[in-house]
């Protein structure tokens, strides 16, 4: 039986609240292919993708999921056509400005993770403003990976730790997973329980390489702009049927 979108404002009855993932991460893939299929410019796929993300964020809030992390812009995305990159930077800035008031009212705490210093200054300013305005919110935690690369994240953490050892602030035998995680972009954010990737591609694409050590992965052929609450419901049903062993028998 297919559950309709209109029936999904509250947690579906076939999902057990105690088995929901606390933290969901998404690789939002397929905006360009969606636009091409519709006979539209690629930028229209990105615009439609923003709408899909906004609804997923509200769905997570409505259904009681505590955290959502979205892969918005990777370090490799700078290689895309300049016109597309410039559009994305402008789009991020405009969406932040337009949605901030609503995020505050809906008790969303927003955080950006990645090498933010390389972003346009105007976008950095909007990011800082949104994080400051929502820092005391205690509803859903929404992390946006922007200019993010998993390998780069690990490298910068290693450099930061090595510098502290060199300065005598940290001893080599004090370095453990907890210390390492404090130096990641995602410091203070719990690891994802579930990673969803749209468009059918079966790879991590340099996303949350450390954090996904024991996370469950769900792949759907649905392109990101078409990912809705019905698709999310399918992903959560699949997740709840799995047995998480964390390396144990």
UniProtKB/Swiss-Prot annotation:
Enzyme class: transferase
Binding site for Mg(2+): 29, 216
Residues that hold substrate according to the record: 30-34, 42, 46, 74-76, 78, 80, 197, 203-205
Entry-linked InterPro entries: UPP_synth-like, UPP_synth-like_CS, UPP_synth-like_sf
Entry EC no(s): 2.5.1.-
Cofactor(s) of this protein: Mg(2+)
Name of a matching Pfam family: Prenyltransf
Cofactor, how bound (note): Binds 2 magnesium ions per subunit.
One GO-annotated biological process of the protein: polyprenol biosynthetic process
Keyword presence, Glycoprotein: no
Keywords carried by this UniProt record: Magnesium, Metal-binding, Transferase
UniProt xrefs under PANTHER family: DEHYDRODOLICHYL DIPHOSPHATE SYNTHASE 2, DEHYDRODOLICHYL DIPHOSPHATE SYNTHASE FAMILY MEMBER
Subunit and partners: Homodimer.
Descriptive protein name: Isoprenyl transferase
